[in-house]
């Protein structure tokens, strides 16, 4: 069962002449990896303010961290969620990743000892994008972590990270309604499986359409499966394997009135053209990472194979390899 003891590590910073506490809190347990998180990692270093209410609820303000902070697998310490070669393919909500330079305001309400609801409002300091998400989390099932969320994303001048203007029309913003689910299962002390799935429906809002007559709603999805194993070759090593299909448009089309020719009296004759936004192929990322730390010597080997990059209709395979070494003083 999950051990409900909380571990909190704090670092004092002086900001604007007052003291704030930078803290990252996670659930440690006997089933999932309870090794200490490296708080000096840039992915974790941030300013976080916490306030606990009398009814075991909590208010958090998290600045300059991933928009996925305290959502999904970020709530537990699990070594399988450690993809390193392709940052866009991590086991996190892909839609929230479109919020740049986020500030996360969250409210946690415990329904029971092992159940809670999270409500997050995520604002961007880069543009006018923002998101709202509510998540249900259950850790009462033995060796399992389950979360399910629904949310809303408003992107400024973009839809799923893409923007355009000029003759094609001027995109004002887009609205995306999404669902997201996470499952972690600990088979035994040294083996764990993580599964992440997301689904969304997006609508583009234009200031003016230009050549575009109609821009349909876009249906998109994402999934990733990760497997982690300790002691593959030695007692103090960790290895991870993952299969990811990155975010993909499953359906959507654009209807355009394309100029074909002009008549003698300068009348523009247009021809309607329908563009299918859904690619025929699926991009698949296969990744393997091996890490061993012995006597303060840290070795890491990573291999990433990208099949049909960007969901290209032309079959292709790209391979990336990474080898790193660090010594901890």
For the regions a language model picked out, list residue spans one by one:
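C-terminal alpha-helix/helix-terminus motif
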Residues: 11, 327-329
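Outer membrane beta-barrel transmembrane domains
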Residues: 92-99, 106-108, 126, 146-173, ...
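Outer membrane beta-barrel translocator domains of Type V secretion systems
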Residues: 3-187, 198
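Beta-barrel outer-membrane channel/assembly domains of diderm bacteria
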Residues: 42, 315-327
